[in-house]
């Protein structure tokens, strides 16, 4: 690996780790209705499992309700089954091709559990960032050992990698803090 590409590659890997965290945090339920809450729902349709968003339109008419407008009338029971199997803790009311999902208020205890889960996701992401940093430093050591870079370059690049790691680590902290505020807001 070339020294010029190393930092860029590490940055791309760290960016992917942050995206994964973002997707995990989207799946955590806050007190407000969000269509992202249904991202994990798959529906048995046309002989395979497909995401709910490919057979219905999703909307949030108010802060406590998600509407699922199924496009094909024959798919309504499959969509209901998919929502039930996803085990989201939601009950649904079906009216023709419209499925309403009322979002119950979170208890204080459940909010605290979700905050703990968000912090766990954050810590897992930080571990990924540290592993990416470690891999980058090991690559630098190989480059130095093979006399591709000199010791000064090694120290300079390792400091840059550390700064990059710190930058992404602070992004994790701010994402977790923001999600915690969303969860704890009643």
From Swiss-Prot:
What GO MF annotations does this protein's record show? ribosomal large subunit binding
Q: Does the keyword Protein biosynthesis apply?
A: yes
Q: Which domain of life is it from?
A: Bacteria
On whether Glycosyltransferase is a keyword of this UniProt record, the answer is no
Chief location category: cytoplasm
Annotated Pfam families: RRF (PF01765)
Q: Report the GO terms under cellular component.
A: cytosol
Keywords, sorted A to Z: Cytoplasm, Protein biosynthesis
CDD domains given in the database record: RRF (cd00520)
Compartment(s) where it occurs, according to its Swiss-Prot or TrEMBL record: Cytoplasm
Which GO terms fall under biological process for this protein? cytoplasmic translational termination
Q: According to its UniProt entry, what is the function of this protein? A: Responsible for the release of ribosomes from messenger RNA at the termination of protein biosynthesis. May increase the efficiency of translation by recycling ribosomes from one round of translation to another.
Q: Which family does it belong to?
A: Belongs to the RRF family.
What name does this protein carry? Ribosome-recycling factor
Gene for this protein?
frr
């Amino acid at each position: 690996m070339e020294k010029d590409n190393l930092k860029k590659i590490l940055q791309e890997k760290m960016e992917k780790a942050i995206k994964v965290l973002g997707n995990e945090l989207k799946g955590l339920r806050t007190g407000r209705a969000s269509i992202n809450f249904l991202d994990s729902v798959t529906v048995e349709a046309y002989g395979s499992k497909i995401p709910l968003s490919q057979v219905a339109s999703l909307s949030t008419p108010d802060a406590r309700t998600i509407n699922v407008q199924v496009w094909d009338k024959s798919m309504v029971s499959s969509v209901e089954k998919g929502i039930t199997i996803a085990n989201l803790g939601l009950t649904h009311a079906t009216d023709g091709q419209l499925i309403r999902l009322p979002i119950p208020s979170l208890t204080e205890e459940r909010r605290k559990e979700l905050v703990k889960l968000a912090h766990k996701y954050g810590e897992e992401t930080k571990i990924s960032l540290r592993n990416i940093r470690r891999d980058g430093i090991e690559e630098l050591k190989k480059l130095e050992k093979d006399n591709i870079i000199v010791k000064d370059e090694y120290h300079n690049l390792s400091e840059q990698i550390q700064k990059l790691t710190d930058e992404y680590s602070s992004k994790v902290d701010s994402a977790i803090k923001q999600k915690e505020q969303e969860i704890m807001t009643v």
